Structures are given as C-alpha cells and as structure tokens.
Amino acid sequence: MLNSCINKIKKKKNIKKIILMLIFIFSVNFFTKNTNQGKQYEDKLNKDFTNIKKINIKNKLVNQKEFLLQLEKIKIFSPNLYSKNISIYNAILKWLKKRAEINELNKFRIKLFQMKGVDQYGNVKITGYYTPIVKASKIKKNNFIYPIYRTPSNFKKNEKLPQRKDIYNGFLKKEYILAYSDSLINNFIMEIQGSGFIDYGDNKPLIFFGYAKKNNWPYTSIGQILIKNGDIQKKNISMNTIKNWCTHHTQKEIQNLLEKNKSFVFFQETKRKEVYGSSAVPLVEKAAIAVDKSVIKIGSVVLVKIPVLDKNGIFIHKYEMHLLIALDVGGVIKGQHFDVYQGIGEKAGKLAGFYNHYGYAWVLKI
C-alpha cells in the first residue's frame, strides 16, 4: 500500500515536470519566433491610432540629415503638399533646431499617435524597396535577350492586356520593346520596385525607366509559392533568398515560377535623374516611405522604431529611431505596413531585400 502511494506521488511529480518542460519549450519558441523579426509585446492597443502623451525613448534620431533633405524636396517639388502639412513640419523643425530629446516632442505641441500594428500590440510591418540598376542593350545580342516592354498601344483603356506567360512567349510585337536585359529575374525585380535605371554600358549616362501601366491581371506572390513548395522557409523569405533560389535553378524553372504571377508591369523611358514617388516628389533614401494611403495620408510624418540588422540581415535585438515621410504607395502595401525607401543600386537592394520585420510607429500631428 505504501509503495503504491509512493509510486503515484512519483508519477504526479514526473507529470508536473513534463508539463513545466513543455510550457518552457513553448514559451522559448514563441518568444524566439516573435522577436527575431523585431516584434515587441507591451500594451495592447484597441484603436487604429492611440494618442500617447509621452514616450520614454532615449535613442537619438539616426536620419536627421536625410529627413531635412526630404523636407526640402517636398518644399521645392510639391509646394501644395508642403503647405498642407506646414504646421507639423514647422513644429518638427523647431524641435530639431533645439536638439531636444524624443521624449520632449510634447513641449513643441507635437502629438504622438501610436499605430496599433498588425496585431494590436503596435507591431507595424516594415519592409524595404529600392531602385535597381539593370544592365541592358538596345538590341538583342549575346546574353541580352530578355525584353523590357513599353505599354502596347493597340488595347482599349480597361482591357486586360496579355498575361505574363503570353508576353514571355512573344505575344507582343517587337516595336514595344524598350531594351533587352541579361536577366529575367532582374526585369521582374524592376517590376516589383516599380522603376529602375538602365545601364547601357560604355560609361553612358543611366536612363530612368519609370512605371507606365500594369496588364490588369491579378498579382501572385512568388515568395508565397516558394514557401508553399517548401523551397524557402517562411521566416527566411526575402528578395535576397528568392534571388539565391534563382542562382540554383535553370532559366526554364525560373520562368515557370515567374509565370505563376500573371501580373506584368510596362515601363516608359524618362529624362528624370531622380526617383520620384507617387507624390511627384524625389525620394530620399531612409527618409521616404510607401504607405497605404487609406491608413496614412501622403505627406504625414511618422516616427518609427526600426530593427537594426547585421550584414547578413539578422536582427541584432537593437532598434534605431527614424523620422519618415509618407511620399509613395505600393500595390502590396496594405494596412499597418511601411515600405522604407533604401536608395539606388545593389547595396540598397541587398538591404531592402533583408527587411521583413516589425517596429513601433507614431504618427506626428499638431
């Protein structure tokens, strides 16, 4: 009888140990899963925007120079937009001139409205975009065999243009070809980014190809396809990992993947030397963001706590404070999501490709 009781007690203790072990493992996994992308869990936010009287942040701004340059470009290129937001712009300029702390914004009549994020804990999705430089030729030669198209003129305004697969198979006339690149995936990336600089080589000036039109077919994320197929883990998906996948697959396999996205972007050659957002204002790297304008008005200033990444794109559990201005939109930028403009070229592209993270954001108002 005594031995039976002892065995029952031991079993209960073992069960408790197992339960505690499972709770610990679950907690560690949950914490790791939700912090390797910069997510934070503090107060729950019930409103889309919650007025915060004061934030206790001692970090300094890291992009003051870029922010001031971006403000100047708004003033020059869009006086109307500047005028609409002049009260908040002037208040921020006074705050910067006094070299005041972030937790002193309220002393300058600046109100902070924290965004609820994707999960009501303030975690706003942060991605990056950039302007690629694509090597190309005006004629088809050597490795330059992948056409970049302008908008076909023989279609009605709201008519669906050919889908990607048909275009790849030569449906459009050659007269609509602007240039030939040496990389199908680079053409695709330029479509995703919405524009790009074309490098014809021989030290010729770069030519800017701007967005002209879509073919009106639905957009399908090739990243989601690669995740579903088990080629790339969801936590690792980025433009960099997609490009890496391409380097290990044949051209036919790459084309088959891209054809699953029926949407296609056409371009137009322009004389612009700077990259413009939808606001018709030149974008300054690390100062401009693309937003969902049904959530954030164009011209709005947002204070954002952005995760810091190492050279391999790994979050190092540190954050930097940025002042960003909403000057662009994007087809896949929906809801509580910012796309931070990273600049021009390969280095900017690598950084933009890393970002699929989360940070706190406060819209600044008077």
From Swiss-Prot:
GO molecular function, one term: peptidoglycan lytic transglycosylase activity
SUPFAM superfamilies: Barwin-like endoglucanases (SSF50685)
Catalytic reactions on record: Exolytic cleavage of the (1->4)-beta-glycosidic linkage between N-acetylmuramic acid (MurNAc) and N-acetylglucosamine (GlcNAc) residues in peptidoglycan, from either the reducing or the non-reducing ends of the peptidoglycan chains, with concomitant formation of a 1,6-anhydrobond in the MurNAc residue
Keyword vocabulary terms for this entry: Cell wall biogenesis/degradation, Lyase
Record InterPro entries: 3D_dom, MltA, MltA_B, RlpA-like_sf
Enzyme class: lyase
Statement: the UniProt record of this protein carries the keyword Ligase: no
GO CC term (a single one): outer membrane
A Gene Ontology BP annotation from the UniProt entry: peptidoglycan catabolic process
Keyword Cell wall biogenesis/degradation: yes
Pfam families: 3D (PF06725), MltA (PF03562)
Enzyme Commission no: 4.2.2.n1
NCBIfam families for this protein: PRK11162.1 (NF008366)
PANTHER family: MEMBRANE-BOUND LYTIC MUREIN TRANSGLYCOSYLASE A (PTHR30124:SF0)
Function: Murein-degrading enzyme. May play a role in recycling of muropeptides during cell elongation and/or cell division.
Name the record gives this protein: Membrane-bound lytic murein transglycosylase A homolog
Lineage: Bacteria, Pseudomonadati, Pseudomonadota, Gammaproteobacteria, Enterobacterales
